Amino acid sequence: MAEQEQRKIPLVPENLLKKRKAYQALKATQAEQALLAKKEQRKGKGLRFKRLESFLHDSWRQKRDMVRLRRLEMKPHALELPDKHSLAFVVRIERIDGVSLLVQRTIARLRLKKIFSGVFVKVTPQNLKMLRIVEPYVTWGFPNLKSVRELILKRGQAKVKNKTIPLTDNTVIEEHLGKFGVICLEDLIHEIAFPGKHFQEISWFLRPFHLSVARHATKNRVGFLKEMGTPGYRGERINQLIRQLN
């Protein structure tokens, strides 16, 4: 019977074993520190107490919304579709704490979850109805080609695989919008400014625009109204606001 050859187990150098052990100990320490930091962060947050005035204000807001929306149902005098305008730009300029659920859902459908954000919307009867629902919290109007171009060039960002990327590469635009005939930034600007049958897909490719508002204006109501103006429809005067906040 042939003798079986003994297989030699390769020896690991002692210095390499020490390095591995030190590395594993370091990773364990880092994981423990991260866990402790997370617990401390949770402790630091604590409970958030809401003042009685806030509850009263939210209740008043909900009642006001209910009355306003009921009036819209009884007398749905929607704005007439303009002949020469097919594009609107909507900016959210008010907080929505305590508003009705319908207003919250409509704000979400318009992708205006953050205050001082804006989106392009195609002028249709359905969209005009949505704008009437959220009218006390947004301002909107009809942007011209210059405003569309300036917004997209300065603040345009795209949504690609749940990531936000700047519109600096035409290959990205062609890759995602080429099937709609949009292969460069100029094509995208044209398709937004003059809405066509693929406006929905192209506009949703863009992230909502985050406008620049002075900090003092957000804290000072008088300064805020002076800089932003009041909510509601403002027609072509939206172009002045875009240039002011872009």
Swiss-Prot record:
CDD domains the record matches = Ribosomal_L7_archeal_euk
Would you tell me the protein name for this molecule? Large ribosomal subunit protein uL30-like 1
Task: Please name the Pfam families in this protein's record.
Answer: Ribosomal_L30, Ribosomal_L30_N
Could you say which residues form the signal peptide? none
A single GO BP: maturation of LSU-rRNA from tricistronic rRNA transcript (SSU-rRNA, 5.8S rRNA, LSU-rRNA)
Q: Which organism is it from?
A: Pongo abelii
Q: Which domain of life is it from?
A: Eukaryota
Q: Which Gene3D superfamilies match?
A: Ribosomal protein L30, ferredoxin-like fold domain
Instruction: Please name the gene that encodes this protein.
Output: RPL7L1
